[in-house]
Amino acid sequence: MWLGVVTLFPEMFRAVTDFGVTGRAVSKGLLEMQTWNPRDFTHDKHKTVDDRPYGGGPGMLMMVQPLRDAIHAAKAAAGKEAKVIYLSPQGRKLTQQGVEELAKSSSLVLVCGRYEGVDERIIQTEVDEEWSIGDYVLSGGELPAMTLIDSVSRLVPGVLGKKASAEQDSFSDGLLDCPHYTRPESMDGLDVPAVLLSGNHEHIRRWRLQQSLGRTLLRRPELLENLALTGEQEQLLAEFVDSIKQDA
């Protein structure tokens, strides 16, 4: 997958290219990323990229010309099929379903705003989609862009050691992930559930599914409203609810 990022702070993206899962993906050639700084496309000695908004109001806006030219440069490198995404609080909220949709793209150009945002004409003429990572305020689009890159790259074939790693992540099937344990078997009076030590793969599968369903019910019940549960899932969830009532 090819990713282009338009940002005033390209150095921030070393966190993506140099570390962790995404860093390994870059080193293996599974993920390619380039950055474009709008300041490099200015025509004045001060490299001005922002100006006051028409109509007044607080803060500054990113100007059209430097940002537009940076986007054009990124698109030229990406090819005609590239989708231009602006990270914005007004955008579609990023979910695992959205991540899976974006992962089908061979190339993406991510535009990171700063200050009070960008001139609306950039969105009208250059942006294909707007995406948001949540209903809260950040200082710029860089952190949302890195979040999107990390989540999408996990679905690129070969990035994770095992396909099952991505399939078992929270939200991959619409549910939260189940609890996980590693050594030691006992710590401070807390023991690993016996079923995980049993070696019975079917029992382990059902336990994990039940825990995933139960955790979703307790922590994010709204997620269950959008799911059509199978007969097995309904049974496991009912058993989980009964066990909670008995322990109460």
Swiss-Prot record:
<comment type="similarity">
    <text>Belongs to the RNA methyltransferase TrmD family.</text>
</comment>
<dbReference type="InterPro" id="IPR002649">
    <property type="entry name" value="tRNA_m1G_MeTrfase_TrmD"/>
</dbReference>
<comment type="subunit">
    <text>Homodimer.</text>
</comment>
<feature type="binding site">
    <location>
        <position position="113"/>
    </location>
    <ligand>
        <name>S-adenosyl-L-methionine</name>
    </ligand>
</feature>
<keyword id="KW-0489">Methyltransferase</keyword>
<dbReference type="InterPro" id="IPR029028">
    <property type="entry name" value="Alpha/beta_knot_MTases"/>
</dbReference>
<dbReference type="InterPro" id="IPR016009">
    <property type="entry name" value="tRNA_MeTrfase_TRMD/TRM10"/>
</dbReference>
<keyword id="KW-0819">tRNA processing</keyword>
<dbReference type="GO" id="GO:0002939">
    <property type="term" value="P:tRNA N1-guanine methylation"/>
</dbReference>
<feature type="binding site">
    <location>
        <begin position="133"/>
        <end position="138"/>
    </location>
    <ligand>
        <name>S-adenosyl-L-methionine</name>
    </ligand>
</feature>
<keyword id="KW-0949">S-adenosyl-L-methionine</keyword>
<dbReference type="GO" id="GO:0005829">
    <property type="term" value="C:cytosol"/>
</dbReference>
<keyword id="KW-0963">Cytoplasm</keyword>
<dbReference type="GO" id="GO:0052906">
    <property type="term" value="F:tRNA (guanine(37)-N1)-methyltransferase activity"/>
</dbReference>
<comment type="function">
    <text>Specifically methylates guanosine-37 in various tRNAs.</text>
</comment>
<keyword id="KW-0808">Transferase</keyword>
<protein>
    <recommendedName>
        <fullName>tRNA (guanine-N(1)-)-methyltransferase</fullName>
        <ecNumber>2.1.1.228</ecNumber>
    </recommendedName>
</protein>
<dbReference type="InterPro" id="IPR029026">
    <property type="entry name" value="tRNA_m1G_MTases_N"/>
</dbReference>
<dbReference type="Pfam" id="PF01746">
    <property type="entry name" value="tRNA_m1G_MT"/>
</dbReference>
<dbReference type="InterPro" id="IPR023148">
    <property type="entry name" value="tRNA_m1G_MeTrfase_C_sf"/>
</dbReference>
